[in-house]
């Protein structure tokens, strides 16, 4: 709950502009996932994708930020360019939100800001289920989840939130089973493997995370053939980045 409230607060109070890493690219992923055909762009949306002056200019006061929002909203009705759709699994939640907001005629500012809410929700849910699985170390995970950088990324267009959140779930199931007596259940194995596989879909550079399930203690594995077969499926799952 605290993660969600903190992230939403950051989202709402942050000035509009290029305030995070590669906003132009990540917003393009989101808006490209908002349609199954060509995606129409309004002038302010194109400003985001091209880092136009009206979008990236700095504002120092509330009044300046309000004026900037009004300037961007002024030309948000007309479509001036079309781009190809490109549905991505990690950007799809934001894409669906953007599509719904467009359906109801929301202006650019509302679309841009509320399109980030699914990112906050996914991150918050990942943190919740990860902490729920651990027997001890919940506070350590909570501290990591509440790092200002993590919250800031979660309140902006980014697929890094997806990586952080699902890695937390995967690690929680791995560590949680190490803390328990008995063998690893098939259910926990599947959840752990899927979490790691989903986490690295946006960035295959994190491929090393798929090795973690293979490091489970031997005495925790009841059926080694079955366990390692499930772990190997992660390499197949990660290929399904739509």
Sequence positions of predicted segments:
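Alpha-helical transmembrane segments of integral membrane proteins
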Residues: 1-2, 140, 163, 187-195, ...
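Transmembrane signal-anchor helices characteristic of membrane glycosylation enzymes that use polyprenol
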Residues: 1-66, 233-242
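Interfacial juxtamembrane loops and adjacent helix segments
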Residues: 31-114
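Transmembrane-helix signature of polytopic, membrane-embedded enzymes
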Residues: 106-109, 128-149
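Specific aromatic-rich, kink-prone transmembrane helix
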Residues: 129, 164-181, 190-196
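Membrane-interface alpha helices of multi-pass inner-membrane proteins
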Residues: 152, 188-204, 209-215
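Short acidic/glycine- and proline-prone juxtamembrane loop motifs at membrane-interface regions
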Residues: 156-163
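Perimembrane helix-loop-helix junctions
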Residues: 173-183, 207-238
């Amino acid at each position: 709950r605290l993660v969600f409230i903190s992230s939403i607060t950051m989202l709402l109070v942050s000035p509009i502009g290029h305030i995070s890493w590669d906003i132009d690219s990540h917003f393009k992923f989101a808006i490209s996932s908002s349609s199954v055909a060509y995606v129409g762009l309004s002038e302010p949306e194109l400003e985001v994708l091209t880092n136009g002056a009206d979008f990236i200019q700095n504002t120092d006061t509330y009044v300046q930020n309000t004026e900037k929002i009004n300037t961007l909203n002024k030309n948000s009705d007309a479509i001036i360019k079309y781009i190809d759709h490109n549905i991505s699994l990690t950007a799809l939640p934001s894409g669906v939100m953007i599509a719904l907001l467009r359906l109801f005629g929301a202006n650019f500012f509302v679309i841009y800001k509320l399109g980030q809410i699914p990112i906050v929700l996914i991150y918050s849910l990942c943190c919740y289920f990860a902490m729920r699985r651990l027997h001890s170390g919940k506070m350590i995970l909570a501290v990591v989840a509440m790092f200002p950088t993590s919250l800031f990324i979660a309140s902006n267009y980014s697929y890094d939130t997806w990586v952080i959140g699902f890695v937390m779930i995967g690690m929680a199931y791995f560590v949680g089973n190490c803390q328990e007596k008995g063998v690893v259940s098939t259910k926990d194995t599947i959840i752990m493997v899927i979490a790691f596989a989903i986490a690295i879909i946006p960035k295959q550079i994190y491929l090393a995370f798929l090795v973690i399930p293979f490091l489970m203690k031997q005495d925790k594995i009841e059926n080694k053939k079955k366990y390692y077969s499930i772990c190997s499926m992660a390499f197949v799952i990660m290929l399904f980045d739509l």
